[in-house]
């Protein structure tokens, strides 16, 4: 009789205790406890001078079973934007935009994190800074779709880059302007 009376009480207490401990700890696919303290890693990323070093910090995080969170990825995007180059000696054909897009892809497909407005803002800032207004238009569209808007100052700066390219005659890539137009070709 006593077992029937106390059984629901003990079961609910045990279930509440288990739920409290499992909510505080995260486990990976293989049952190992995952470290969720990303603050020291973010500090390491912020101290990196080149963005290749920040990538190494992300690798070390994964090795230490501490998967990056959205704040870590955003700190890495900021590092890519602010660093002068990938390495101490510039690499041929390096592209900060490509590095950022690669990181966003890793976020989404590997760690199943959706980039937020801050993530896309760093990419848009790089488009404006590098003068790549066409890519800026694309990122603006993505931000309007995903984040419901793009910062007005970045939109204005991107438009200024487009107008500057138009006045300099560089609105379209040079190799396209050298080709004959479809309607300019005379067929005999």
UniProtKB/Swiss-Prot annotation:
PPR repeats lie at residues 36-70, 75-109, 116-146. One of its GO terms (biological process) is proton transmembrane transport. InterPro entries: TPR-like_helical_dom_sf. It is found in: Mitochondrion; Mitochondrion inner membrane. Keywords: ATP synthesis, CF(1), Hydrogen ion transport, Ion transport, Membrane, Mitochondrion, Mitochondrion inner membrane, Repeat, Transit peptide, Transport. GO terms for cellular component: mitochondrial inner membrane; proton-transporting ATP synthase complex. Disruption phenotype: RNAi-mediated knockdown of the protein impairs assembly of the F(1) component and slows the proliferation rate of procyclic cells that are cultivated in vitro in the presence of glucose. RNAi-mediated knockdown of the protein also slows the proliferation rate of the bloodstream form of the parasite, despite the fact that the organism can profit from blood glucose as source of energy. Mitochondrial membrane potential is dramatically reduced in the bloodstream form that relies on ATP hydrolysis to maintain mitochondrial membrane potential. It is a peripheral membrane protein. Residues 1-18 form a transit peptide. F-type ATPases have 2 components, F(1) - the catalytic core - and F(o) - the membrane proton channel. F(1) has five subunits: alpha(3), beta(3), gamma(1), delta(1), epsilon(1), plus the additional subunit P18 (Tb427.05.1710) that is not present in F(1)F(o) ATP synthase from metazoa. Subunit P18 (Tb927.5.1710) interacts with the alpha subunit with a 1:1 stoichiometry; the interaction is direct. Subunit gamma is part of the central stalk. F(o) has three main subunits: a, b and c. Mitochondrial membrane ATP synthase (F(1)F(o) ATP synthase) produces ATP from ADP in the presence of a proton gradient across the membrane which is generated by electron transport complexes of the respiratory chain. F-type ATPases consist of two structural domains, F(1) - containing the extramembraneous catalytic core, and F(o) - containing the membrane proton channel, linked together by a central stalk and a peripheral stalk. During catalysis, ATP synthesis in the catalytic domain of F(1) is coupled via a rotary mechanism of the central stalk subunits to proton translocation. This is ATP synthase subunit p18, mitochondrial. It comes from Trypanosoma brucei brucei.
